[in-house]
Regions:
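A short glycine-threonine-serine/GTX helix/turn-capping micro-motif
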Residues: 142-151, 198
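Rossmann-fold NAD(P)-dependent oxidoreductase module
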Residues: 2-7, 163
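NAD(P)-dependent Rossmann-like dehydrogenase/reductase catalytic/cofactor-binding core
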Residues: 176-179, 183-245
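A general structural signal for well-ordered alpha-helical segments in protein cores
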Residues: 23, 43, 55, 81, ...
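Internal alpha-helical scaffold of NAD(P)-dependent oxidoreductase catalytic cores
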Residues: 83-91, 106-142, 152-191, 234, ...
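A generic structural motif
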Residues: 8-13, 129
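Glycine-rich beta-strand-to-loop/alpha-helix junction loops that act as flexible
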Residues: 51, 147-150, 204
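Rossmann-like NAD(P)(H) cofactor-binding subdomain of soluble oxidoreductases
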Residues: 1-2, 14-16, 20-21, 25-30, ...
Length: 245
């Protein structure tokens, strides 16, 4: 929402939310009116940001209010476009953004059920960051590595802060240093392989190599794979649970 507001001040938003606390939070942050019931939607884009478990109830209650010219945009993990098509005949686009789009510099993987750029929505999305279309069968792994991706890096950062604190730095200093480290990383990332960048940073028998050797001896690759695999399997499981409802 913040990214879209930054992108075009002339966009019109109609927000619907059941939870009173969330409604108040939106009103305070964006100064928007928020309704708890959907009006008849004749045109435009309906962005679904609800919990997957609430999807059936949402469409059972509201599908007759969503007219055929409305583009349905979903960001729900594990929910396939084919499942939504059971309720409505509308064009559907599925996205897997992450929080970086609020600053209009994100990356948005998408898949859609139609060919053209309906309502110029892809053009609008490109203002939030780069966009790339994928086969929907890849969305489980995309959800795991990109949708959940920021959490992996921030969890690692949190553990580094804890370790630095145990080794003598104050928590505030540790947080400051890691924050500066994270801000510097984009300048290192380009067309080069990550492994090549690591090689450029480390030196023989140096501190970086010592740390990497420790990670390898503790099966860091297995730890990372298990985490990504667990997230991927959870996305698959969510999809199965929804399809069986």
């Amino acid at each position: 929402l913040k990214g879209l507001i930054n992108l075009d001040k002339n966009l019109t938003f109609h927000l619907y939310e059941k939870e009173p606390k969330v409604m108040e939070s939106i009103k305070e942050e964006f100064n928007f009116d928020v309704k708890n019931e959907i009006d008849v939607i004749e045109s435009g884009i309906l962005l679904l940001c609800i919990k997957p478990k609430d999807l059936n109830k949402f469409f059972d209650t509201n599908k007759d209010k969503i007219l055929k010219d409305v583009l349905i945009c979903t960001v729900l993990a594990g929910v396939e476009t084919a499942y939504i098509s059971k309720f409505v005949e509308n064009k559907i686009i599925r996205l897997m953004p992450n929080l970086s789009i609020k600053n209009n510099n994100g990356f948005i993987p998408y898949t859609k059920t139609y060919q053209e750029d309906y309502l110029s929505f892809l053009e609008l999305l490109s203002g939030l960051g780069s966009i790339t279309e994928y086969e929907e069968e890849l969305f489980h792994i995309i959800t795991a590595i990109y949708g959940s991706g920021p959490a992996w890096y921030l969890e690692l950062s949190s553990r580094i802060v804890e370790s630095a604190t145990k080794l003598g730095l104050s928590k505030s200093e540790s947080n400051k240093i890691i924050n500066e480290l994270l801000k510097s990383l984009p300048s290192l990332v380009g067309g080069d392989e990550f492994s090549n960048i690591v090689e450029k940073i480390k030196s023989p028998k140096g501190t970086t190599e010592a740390g990497i050797n420790s990670l390898n001896s503790d099966s860091f690759d297995k730890i990372v794979f298990n985490a990504i695999n667990a997230a991927t399997e959870r996305s698959i499981q969510i999809s199965k649970e929804i399809n069986n409802e």
